[in-house]
Amino acid sequence: MDILKKSLFLVLFLGLVSLSICEEEKRENEDEEKQDDEQSEMKRAMWKDVLKKIGTVALHAGKAALGAVADTISQGEQ
């Protein structure tokens, strides 16, 4: 009976240790995923700002080019 108790205790102890290790790894993986999500959101926000600025610059450049063409045409008509 004593051997049975010791072996049962050993099995339970090893089970708890492996469960603890698995939970720790799970927490680490969740933390890594959370960090990856935060980095992805930061990159998305950065690209959104960059593309907005590029669009604004392109809009102003297009307006300036159209103005120059209109000036050239009006000077040619005179």
UniProtKB/Swiss-Prot annotation:
Organs and tissues of expression: Expressed by the skin glands.
Predominant place of localization: secreted
InterPro entries, per database record: Dermaseptin_dom, Frog_antimicrobial_propeptide, FSAP
Entry keywords, A to Z: Amidation, Amphibian defense peptide, Antibiotic, Antimicrobial, Cleavage on pair of basic residues, Fungicide, Secreted, Signal
Propeptide: 23-42, 76-78
Stretch forming the signal peptide: 1-22
GO CC annotation terms, alphabetical: extracellular region
Location in or out of the cell: Secreted
Modified residues (Glutamine amide): Q75
One GO-annotated biological process of the protein: killing of cells of another organism
Functional summary from the UniProt entry: Possesses a potent antimicrobial activity against bacteria, fungi and protozoa. Probably acts by disturbing membrane functions with its amphipathic structure.
Family: Belongs to the frog skin active peptide (FSAP) family. Dermaseptin subfamily.
Record protein name field: Dermaseptin-B1
Organism whose genome encodes this protein: Phyllomedusa bicolor
Lineage: Eukaryota, Metazoa, Chordata, Craniata, Vertebrata
